[in-house]
């Protein structure tokens, strides 16, 4: 298996890290601190970092301030998505259905319709998308 790495960027000069490989450890508490301390979180109310990415699976750590949201994009071909709440709470809605999620709860969603998730308080979640 070929390992894949993310290169450092001006926003994350120490950001070189493995994204895919036989075994990829992910230090979630460290990444949470990192994305909450970056300028984009303070200026935009949200920030995210991809912590794993393979051909079929992407894991993204997302931090949201109260009232901020994440929503489906224009991507197609997603089969399943998981949203795990690490801190805070949020509401997830899709096609007239809404589900409240709090710390430690996991939502599995078959990607049939557009969705959005709105934070009720500062929130951190792990978003897994499977294609």
Please tell me what each predicted stretch does.
Residues 43-48, 60-76:
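Conserved short histidine dyad/triad with adjacent acidic residue
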Residues 69-71, 88-93:
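Short beta-strand segments in beta-sandwich/barrel cores
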Residues 77-91:
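Glycine- and acidic-residue-biased ligand/ion/polar-headgroup-sensing regions
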Residues 86-87, 102-103, 121:
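A cytosolic small-molecule/anion-sensing beta-strand core signal
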């Amino acid at each position: 298996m070929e390992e894949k790495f993310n290169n450092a960027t001006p926003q994350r000069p120490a950001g070189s890290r493995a994204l895919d490989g036989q075994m990829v450890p992910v230090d979630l508490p460290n990444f949470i601190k990192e994305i909450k301390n970056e300028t984009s979180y303070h200026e935009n109310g949200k920030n995210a970092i991809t912590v794993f990415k393979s051909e079929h699976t992407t894991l993204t750590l997302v931090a949201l301030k109260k009232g901020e949201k994440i929503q489906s994009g224009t991507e197609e071909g997603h089969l399943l998505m998981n949203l795990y709440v690490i801190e805070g709470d949020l509401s997830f809605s899709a096609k007239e259905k809404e589900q409240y999620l709090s710390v430690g709860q996991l939502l599995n969603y078959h990607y049939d319709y557009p969705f959005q998730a709105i934070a009720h308080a500062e929130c951190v979640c792990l978003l897994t998308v499977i294609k």
